Amino acid sequence: MSQAISEDQYAPLFAPFFGFAGCAFAMILSCLGAAIGTAKSGIGISGIGTFKPELIMKSLIPVVMSGILAVYGLVVAVLIAGGLSPTEDYTLFNGFMHLSCGLCVGFACLSSGYAIGIVGDVGVRKYMHQPRLFVGIVLILIFSEVLGLYGMIVALILNTRGSGN
């Protein structure tokens, strides 16, 4: 009546835990980075909004860039979740590969969000006093955003290695 669960040497029963952990780390850490970036830069935007309300729309760039970081984590989490199946053997190699994918994009987006938050907060406040700083601030924000993109690229490369393609 009951079906016996067989355990393979290369596909132990605990291997999917690492894949699920990678999926969770990708979402949790990248959303944490997006939240930090949004909160820190949002403080600067609210600070200048009381003095120069006309600058608020132009100052929303750091908030938008922080939100993109959560999308990076979402993409990797969906790809990891697509590789998990209860009916197929899931090797320990794939479990560790998916864990490293999640940690890679998660920590990259966390550090990127922190950088965007600091640059966005200080940049918006200084932009209020000197509008010529806008281009330089946007360039620094782009370089900060690219840190999260690098993590996603490495996670995608790792994910394709884990799937055997």
Swiss-Prot record:
Membrane topology recorded in Swiss-Prot or TrEMBL: Multi-pass membrane protein
Organism domain of life: Eukaryota
Protein purpose: Proton-conducting pore forming subunit of the V0 complex of vacuolar(H+)-ATPase (V-ATPase), a multisubunit enzyme composed of a peripheral complex (V1) that hydrolyzes ATP and a membrane integral complex (V0) that translocates protons. V-ATPase is responsible for acidifying and maintaining the pH of intracellular compartments.
Main location per the UniProt record: membrane
Residues in the Lumenal compartment per record: 1-16, 81-98, 158-165
Site, as annotated: Essential for proton translocation: E145
Sequence similarity: Belongs to the V-ATPase proteolipid subunit family.
Encoding gene (name): VMA11
Ion transport in keyword set: yes
Subcellular location(s) of the protein: Vacuole membrane
Pfam families (alphabetical): ATP-synt_C (PF00137)
InterPro entries: ATPase_proteolipid_c-like_dom, ATPase_proteolipid_csu, ATPase_proteolipid_su_C_euk, F/V-ATP_Csub_sf
Cytoplasmic face of the membrane: 38-59, 120-136
Name the record gives this protein: V-type proton ATPase subunit c'
TM spans (from-to): 17-37, 60-80, 99-119, 137-157
Gene Ontology terms for molecular function: proton-transporting ATPase activity, rotational mechanism
Assembly with partners or alone: V-ATPase is a heteromultimeric enzyme composed of a peripheral catalytic V1 complex (components A to H) attached to an integral membrane V0 proton pore complex (components: a, c, c', c'', d, e, f and VOA1). The decameric c-ring forms the proton-conducting pore, and is composed of eight proteolipid subunits c, one subunit c' and one subunit c''.
Keyword tags: Hydrogen ion transport, Ion transport, Membrane, Transmembrane, Transmembrane helix, Transport, Vacuole
Any GO CC annotation of this UniProt entry: proton-transporting V-type ATPase, V0 domain
